[in-house]
Amino acid sequence: SFIDAMTSVKLRTGTTHKIFKWFWDVFTPLDRSMHAADMYLDVLQQLGVQDLSNNGLEIFPGEEHFLEAELFWQEQNITDQDKLIGFNIGSAVPTKRWPPERFAEVADIFAARGYKTVFFGGPMDEEMVAEATGYMQTRPIIATGHFAIGGLAAAMRRCCLIITNDSGPMHVAISQKVPIVAMYGPSNPKLYGPYTKEAVIVTAQPPCQGCADGMKHSCDDLQCMTRMTVEQVVK
């Protein structure tokens, strides 16, 4: 806020805590009772934008992305009759990661029910995915590190469900209107949750109140993640 105030722009606007409102020409107060996306849309309303209707996050893969995804599925011998469930087990914030062995157990359960399971994620997730799949009794498809955002969106569109941590790829799945099951621990799903009706949010029961005043980036306990059970996710 201070740096912005030092610039010579004619109009400064944004959303932040009220103690910083003096740095803005048009100020939208931070409201943690509403979703962050709606809060940012309020900034536009303060600027006079009348039509705030939206379809949520949308990513539009190009033809090359659909071709990339289709070639990948062909290489994995996936047909139109196969039912795919995707898994995204990574997150840039370590405290948001559900244990890999539980993802493995969930994947095995769905594989036993006739689904093909596929693990997504970026290059940074490859070690985690290797650990998770090492626990599995069935053989999944590994797409980790294979796709950039456009290809990932096209590939995720082929899935009937994505099971995911709170992460960037979760929002990519949402952008393709794929139903998701999302695990939420230290971050507040009311503020940062999936911006879609096609989502089931799983939280620890009973919930941990350790991050009531803000998300922790390190924690010696992580009850918010470890209390979430395989049964909750599968259900």
What does each model-identified segment do?
Residues 1-235:
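Catalytic machinery of carbohydrate-active enzymes
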